[in-house]
């Protein structure tokens, strides 16, 4: 059964790949109902990719769907997609490229790609969600399907990577769902109207929804702050709860009424971008950097790597607090993502075995502290008494896993309550 994928249609000033794909889904469905030789779109999905990709889009998400075409009528679908892509190019050519005031990442003009395939390439998805892949990698993979079709600018087609990855994601190990609600055109330039209280009530009523509010600030997390058509996105463990939660929000008079909505199967909150957890020992006490970030030097790592540098950012909350309290010699476990400069950005941290705090030699009954008398020798006091070699001090307990708050985590990060 054929697949259609799309990526890279937005900038910080506007545009929205999910909305463009929603329009495509809507039109494919309308034409199917009118007798066009294809079925209704299936398995509509939103797939997040490697967070450090150099030309990643605003949310670094790509879209795909599966569609059944009557045998011998594939060209009818391809002709439709040709025309749709031409209209898409015209729309996004009017977008302005502005630079971010909260990120040093250079913004680029959109490099949209619409992709038609007859097969999936799961290995490519795993490469694209966990690390850097080149455009040449994507082109080479697509050529393995002789029936593939690419619509893109030959010299500007970075969207091919996301389109191919979205199609290639299986999601059979884990997945979540998102309902994205879109605004009415007349509301685009106005402030989004979704009451905090309604989001709180929705979260309590539908406990299979995910990451709706920041537990610390109590602020809703479902609405973006960018000038895009999205009103809000509700994430959930299943599509039914996402839809019911949406209907519930729309029932509040004070909330903005949406124009339309789309349900996606997603890899959000699955942790797909991180392969495994690691264990190691701190070489030195934590180093506090400018901005309150914590720098950890680790050795004795479980997979045989000699040393690693871990970064706990100020915004990571509980992770940063635990990192700050660590001591040289502590054994920790962590999960995180290696950035292009080599450091690992922590997404989860756990103290496994703590060293003794304020470590000292024990006191002799005479009131003087024992001292070492040499390697592998018992401790000795000036009064002549000896004592087994040991340290005394403050016992520090191990910890449970720590993670950032809901408002300071990556789209892909898997919350502890999903494990």
Give residue ranges: language-model regions:
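Cys/His-rich short segments
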Residues: 350-418
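N-terminal ordered "arm"
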Residues: 2-48
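Structural detector for short beta-strands of small beta-barrel domains
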Residues: 272-291, 358-362
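OB-fold (S1/OB) nucleic-acid-binding surfaces
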Residues: 285-316
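Short, charge-patterned binding micro-sites
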Residues: 44-65
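Long, hydrophobic alpha/beta structural blocks
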Residues: 74-271
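Flexible glycine-rich surface loops and low-complexity tracts that mediate binding to linear polymers
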Residues: 278-285, 328-342
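Short nucleic-acid-contacting surface segments enriched for D/E, G, S/T with interspersed K/R
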Residues: 317-333
